[in-house]
């Protein structure tokens, strides 16, 4: 965008975008998730960042059972929901690890895995969570991803395959939008780095292809002569007639 003249639409848009990129209490990821829980949203780019928040196993009330099968269904379902609320969208591998740690078990055999799959399916059928492949989350968590720093997780959990596409897409959009214009590999590398991943390997590049293509399809970023720039929808904000939130996107 060319230099804006005071009083022009460009100047207003730049002010609007600056305010969004420097979020107040109503522009945080948590605030937008609460909004979209009530109103429904397709996508909201959030601009605050946070450390990866891990579930406290002591909060899940699962210990004291000799076998995983002895855990009451209601207690297991409640534990899954608490983990999802804290870490969602969460990969099945991490979800399983959290449940095992809370219940005092070291590994998940076929029977334990089956119970966890059944719990996910049951909660999904009830509409309490959304299932996307091996990921579980509240519906608004997929529409409003939070940008998290994964660097404090152990190596076994800190894997790109454990990060949902929506969070990877958010990191790409944020990286491009906050920088201006970036070559694809640079955007991918910087997007990974801000999430706590060290470098862009061939596998990482492959992993980021689908989120990047989706961001391009949604006009969150655009391709300019082979480089990436912020798209017209990067700053879009949903609104309802009764809500003061407006959009210039």
Residue spans for each PLM region:
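Short amphipathic alpha-helical heptad-repeat segments
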Residues: 5-12
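A detector of low-complexity, intrinsically disordered, Ser/Thr/Gly/Pro/Ala-rich segments
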Residues: 6, 24, 243-244
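N-terminal compositionally biased, intrinsically disordered segments and leader/signal-like regions
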Residues: 9, 27-29, 247
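Hydrophobic residues in alpha-helical segments
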Residues: 19-20, 84
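Charged, low-complexity interaction regions
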Residues: 20-28
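C-terminal non-catalytic scaffold/interaction domains in large multidomain proteins
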Residues: 33-249
């Amino acid at each position: 965008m060319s230099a804006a003249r005071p009083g022009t639409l460009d100047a207003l848009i730049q002010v609007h975008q600056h305010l969004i990129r420097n979020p107040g209490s109503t522009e945080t990821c948590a605030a937008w998730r609460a909004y979209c829980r009530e109103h429904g949203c397709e996508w909201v780019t959030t601009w605050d960042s946070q450390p990866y928040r891990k579930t406290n196993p002591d909060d899940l009330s699962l210990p004291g059972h000799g076998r995983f099968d002895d855990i009451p269904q209601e207690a297991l379902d409640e534990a899954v929901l608490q983990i999802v609320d804290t870490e969602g969208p969460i990969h099945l591998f991490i979800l399983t690890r959290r449940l095992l740690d809370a219940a005092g078990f070291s590994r998940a055999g076929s029977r334990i895995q089956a119970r966890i799959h059944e719990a996910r399916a049951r909660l999904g059928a009830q509409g309490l969570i959304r299932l996307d492949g091996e990921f579980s989350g509240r519906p608004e968590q997929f529409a409003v991803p939070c940008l998290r720093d994964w660097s404090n997780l152990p190596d076994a959990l800190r894997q790109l395959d454990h990060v949902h596409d929506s969070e990877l897409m958010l990191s790409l959009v944020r990286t491009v939008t906050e920088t201006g214009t970036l070559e694809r590999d640079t955007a991918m590398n910087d997007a990974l780095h801000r999430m706590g991943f060290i470098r862009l390997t061939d596998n990482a590049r492959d992993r980021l292809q689908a989120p990047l293509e989706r961001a391009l399809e949604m006009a969150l970023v655009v391709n300019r002569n082979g480089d990436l720039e912020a798209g017209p929808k990067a700053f879009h904000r949903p609104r309802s007639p009764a809500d003061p939130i407006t959009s210039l996107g």
